[in-house]
Amino acid sequence: SSVLDGTRFNFTTRVTSDAPSIMPKYQNRYGQGFGGEFKYVDGAGSGVNDGADESWGPMLDGRLIDQFFGKAQPWVAHPNNVKDYFQSGTTVSNNLNMVTSGKGMGSRLSITKEDVKGIVPNSSLAKLAGSLSASAVVNSKLTLSGSMQYTQNKGLNRPENGYTEGNPFMTFTWFGRQVDVASLKNKYYNAGSPYGFADGSLYNWNDNYHRNPYWQQYENPAPDSREHIIGQLTANYVFNSWLSGIVRTGSDSYRQTQEEHFSAGNIDRANASFNGGFTASNARAQETNFEGILTARKSVGKFDFTVNGGGNIRRNDRFANGYSTSGILVAGIYNLSNAGIAPTFTNSETRTAVNSMYGSAVATYDRFWTVELTGRNDWSSTLPKENASY
């Protein structure tokens, strides 16, 4: 922290470590399968209950059973197999603050950069935030002020929400208790094929309902970004001892993009006859407001009167589009020119407006008895013309 010619600087750095705070409780007496039986062949039902993703199989007593990583392997529990999937996350945050002050003027600037390494493998989030506020007393009648906030988020492979293939927690809702996630992780490359066997099939514990959670995170890139800007300007003017006015305008806008890339091998999201698929979406929206208010205050004897009158103009605009295909021709190229299956498109655009007028009158007697009247009328573009006023 330092001070220079009426300007104060402050810089801080913070590093935190992240880890799951609560883990589900699992039983560790029985492994994958049904009715106490299991034998792996292809993880899709060709063996004995090897397509099951539930743990109603043989007791985990060390007997030798064919499993996805080899024949006649010890059938033992891995009590921490879900916990071991997660990694230590870190958050590094740097912040710079600058405050200036002078005769009738002042400002404040804050910039924060934050880099997050997620607890889910190969997930990250980069944040940038800035805010600026300033005010100035122009003269005895006019005061100006304004502020702006900007945020930018850029994520990579952040887990999806809900019961979906893109959420590793969906897999862990089931998951064989004998599965060692270290084995799933260590087979990142096998026989030259990512997460695969020599025959090209994916190295996985179950092929009916789930994918290797490491394969899901490393071979299915999902970038997303969002920018958000809020700004406002205000002017206060004092006409005389009893009349003042305020004019302000503000805007709130954002822009976001999201992509999901599906490698060949996805169960639900990529056509098996092609080399993957993808979805992409874009959206932007803005709300603007312009408001003006006049305020009159007058005292007559024991009576105090306050009258307000003003209006507001609000505009909302939103645009969104997206496209997707479940089949691409060349693996790893996620654009429309590489679509092997005709993509689907979505597009929407909305524009709305609301104009408002409002006022109030307050009369107070002897600083105790008060009578107040208020009124407001709005005109909305979303209503039929004959009913737009309310």
Give a label for each model feature:
Residues 70-99, 103, 228, 269-368:
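Outer-membrane beta-barrel transmembrane domain signature of Gram-negative proteins
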Residues 262, 268-269:
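N-terminal, polar/charged subdomain of small-to-medium soluble alpha/beta proteins
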Residues 26-28, 161-165, 263-264, 324-327:
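Short secondary-structure boundary/capping segments
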Residues 379-381:
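Active-site beta-strand/loop architecture of penicillin-binding DD-peptidases
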Residues 171-175, 206, 331, 344:
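Structural alpha/beta core scaffold segments of enzyme domains
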